[in-house]
Amino acid sequence: MLKMKNITKLFLYLNLCLTLLACSKISPKGEIEVKDVTVENFTKLNLKGDFKVFFAKGNQNLVSVETYPNVYKNLDIEVENGILTIEENRKTDQVDFYNITIFGKNDLNEVSLSDKVEMNVSGQVKTPEFSLHLKGNSKFMGAVIAPKSKIEMAEKSNANILGETKNLNLKLADSASIMAPYFYVENLEILSQNGASAGLNIDQEMKGTLENTSKLIFYGEPLNKLTKKDKASVENRKLK
């Protein structure tokens, strides 16, 4: 009976140690290195962590990571079903240099960012349908040209988009913000809640619902079919 108690205590102790290790943050060690990883074809990105990402079209599918050796080893990089996932196993702390460059043969049609990922797109993303999902403190900056677009943002995420789309389905929550006066939208369908805010250039029609203290600034002279609730606001401005 005593032996069984000792085994149980040992198991609980090991479990506690593993939990503490998983919760502890990784601090940089060693010298900054560049590690290149060749990956399979992808058209979707799923990125989670505290790093900056630069995406560009290229002749090969490659992920180039420039950071400290132990920080690099903390990353999971894999492609499954056309989705390139880059994710941290443990959170990082005080990493002063942590950049990832992604080269892809194909245009992206879906991007998902979470935690504190900051992503910049070189050139333009051209695709029949584009989806963007942001949460946490993530940020997206880039040009998008797509007949159909879907953007979902929550928490403190932020987006700055250029380009054009015929139909945009936009869902905002919490304090998410998209300020894109040079993103030309023909038709907008929006659901905005909490304290979210948006700024878009709309040509033909805008419809949907704004709730709580959410705010929409629009440029252009579209047909307005919006429903405002609570203290939500809609403002028309002219581009300077």
Model-derived segments and their meaning:
Residues F11-L21:
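Bacterial N-terminal signal peptides
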